[in-house]
């Protein structure tokens, strides 16, 4: 402790710990965020590269999804962790744009730090950034955004394609984008407030080895990765109004709990106990059969004793289903997921109102795997995608890519507006905010100009990843947008330049709306808002105090 008071630095606190403040901590934070952003930078865009992440036991993941990469990293620095959480939040809320949100946040921080070094107070910078963000969002909504109604189903397919372009299924995006749009349109529902929703979770994705990616299937109905419990059971039950019971309980012989002791003096009593053990579960099965169930799905086991009853009653029984699957099936068919058959009086009952309805339940075969399909569910419609691929790693990555595309199409359908992709929004905002900055008379002008410059990191990174000359392409792109914003209202051709962005395959500037490179407006707005919030949170930090861990206490009995 004595060395603490002898420490020459006057700003050391009177606690066992280390204090870093001023420029040191800002530089540290910027370096940490740049390090995190540089990991994902090269995976941005249609020609972005993948990352292989190996964990401590040797399992590896190959992916190009920003949120997945950052979740698997073990980030030590607190500022870096803020960016990881930022990517995860973007993934949860929008599903796509995780990489770009991290890159924008780190670039904003880097430029803000330069301004601080030039003696501009962080509060002034934050105010300037907030003004810039407000103007940017207004410009996106008023000028760049287009309503989907005017563009039709083709737009949704293009949005799904744009989301897939950077992923493993990018080469087959024509095939998969149609599949994604059809799957989502099939699960359209209306909630209690009368709003139309497209729940991504209602689209079940199953993975089966073998064949190629383009032999994946879209199946109407809910696909369960299970098979019937006995070969003697019917493999198909149809005819409309098929009654389904969803159970979260064990249909196995009841065994006495561990540690229960029963003293008996007559061997016949032992036989009675055995019979009663079997009787308890048989009574349950009878009640389920009497309620009229034709299909029984359970998360636990069904033993041979019960299977015999089900087979005789021509009931299809499926055991060891995932609870999450049963929850969704219960929601789609209107069934109740029963976890206990006891009622309030303590007696066991099974009401027919617990059953759900559908049109058909069938066991279908896909390559070597079999699965149960539940078609024509009564409450909400559902659809399933069965992915085919060479190995686990490619199937996992395909599933992540599909999830991103489904989320993006869902957001577009619910919000109804799209903007051109390919760096178009960022270039347009760059020109607009640069001009806007000159109209602001205070010191915030510098912050707004830096905000504008930071946005160019997206088109620059896209061009660099595509092995193109970024300086030339971005300069050309800016000249198009400058022309569009200075054009007179009657000059339609020059006004249409506002939709121009990068075509990274051919290295040209093209009209993105005609090229079909589109993104939901909400994705762009949300990523700018989130990136700014993360940047502000880190920029406001001017001191970091690391408290030393307490030394382990000595054990008095340790000689």
Curated annotation (Swiss-Prot):
GO biological process: chaperone mediated protein folding independent of cofactor; protein folding
N-acetylserine PTM sites in chain numbering: 2
Recorded GO CC terms: chaperonin-containing T-complex; plasma membrane
Gene3D superfamilies: GroEL, GroEL-like equatorial domain, TCP-1-like chaperonin intermediate domain
Subcellular location(s) per record: Cytoplasm
Protein purpose: Molecular chaperone; assists the folding of proteins upon ATP hydrolysis. Known to play a role, in vitro, in the folding of actin and tubulin. In yeast may play a role in mitotic spindle formation.
Name under which the protein is recorded: T-complex protein 1 subunit alpha
Species of origin: Saccharomyces cerevisiae (strain ATCC 204508 / S288c) (Baker's yeast)
